[in-house]
């Protein structure tokens, strides 16, 4: 019984610490969006030098309540239907211009097979073959990445790529892809990171 009590106390302390880390970068924490506790976690070696941008191919969200509901639904689908340990992306960006904690800065996500243990995956909520990413969404991601560098989660010379460059996918959708490929951190030729 004492062992179980210790494990619960440790889990609560860790959850509190992770909430503080998420809040540190103006991120809506998993606790704030009422997310589930991961079944298991593996830790990323930091700083991470690769950011993979994708989209969720779900409805677009514009309100806090709508985005939180979509993030909860994505997590439930990932954990129940796909048997992931947690929600796949490290972070999600809503149409309300807010960033939602997924697996976060510290944990290995489940967003890009073969790259999860060495990258942060950021998913824009919506289908960006049809939806247009707003300036607020793009700035929310830029702000998150700046904070990640400042806090030592991301390497100062990190590179950003699209999900479609690494696996057979249309993700992050052509409209979002056309925006992010203009960024100075953009890596056009991914040969150097494939199967590294």
Swiss-Prot record:
Induction comment: By bacterial challenge.
GO molecular function: N-acetylmuramoyl-L-alanine amidase activity; peptidoglycan binding; zinc ion binding
Tissues with expression: Constitutively expressed in fat body, epithelial cells and hemocytes. Not detected in Malpighian tubules, silk gland or midgut.
Key words, A-Z: Disulfide bond, Immunity, Innate immunity, Signal
Covalent S-S links between cysteines: 25-147, 61-67
Keyword Ribonucleoprotein: no
Leader peptide range in chain numbering: 1-23
Pfam families the record matches: Amidase_2
GO biological processes: innate immune response; peptidoglycan catabolic process
Residue ranges constituting the N-acetylmuramoyl-L-alanine amidase domain according to the UniProt record: 46-173
Domain of life: Eukaryota
Function: Binds specifically to peptidoglycan and triggers the propenoloxidase cascade which is an important insect defense mechanism.
Protein family membership: Belongs to the N-acetylmuramoyl-L-alanine amidase 2 family.
Subunit note: Monomer.
PANTHER family given in the database record: PEPTIDOGLYCAN RECOGNITION PROTEIN (PTHR11022), PEPTIDOGLYCAN-RECOGNITION PROTEIN SA (PTHR11022:SF74)
Name the record gives this protein: Peptidoglycan recognition protein
Lineage start: Eukaryota, Metazoa, Ecdysozoa, Arthropoda, Hexapoda
């Amino acid at each position: 019984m004492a062992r179980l009590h210790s494990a619960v106390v440790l889990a609560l302390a860790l959850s509190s610490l992770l909430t503080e880390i998420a809040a540190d970068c103006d991120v809506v924490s998993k606790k704030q969006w009422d997310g589930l506790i991961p079944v298991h976690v593996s830790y990323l070696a930091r700083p991470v030098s690769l950011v993979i941008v994708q989209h969720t191919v779900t409805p677009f969200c514009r309100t806090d309540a709508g985005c939180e509901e979509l993030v909860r639904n994505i997590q439930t689908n990932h954990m129940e239907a796909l048997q992931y340990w947690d929600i796949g992306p490290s972070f999600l960006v809503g149409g309300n211009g807010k960033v939602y904690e997924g697996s976060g800065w510290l944990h290995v996500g489940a967003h890009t097979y073969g790259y999860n243990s060495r990258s942060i995956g950021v998913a824009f909520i919506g289908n960006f073959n049809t939806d247009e990413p707003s300036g607020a969404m793009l700035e929310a991601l830029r702000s998150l990445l700046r904070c990640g560098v400042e806090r030592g989660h991301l390497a100062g010379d990190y590179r950003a790529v699209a999900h479609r460059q690494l696996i057979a996918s249309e993700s992050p959708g052509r409209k979002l892809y056309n925006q992010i490929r203009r960024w100075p951190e953009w890596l056009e030729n991914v040969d150097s990171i494939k199967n590294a």
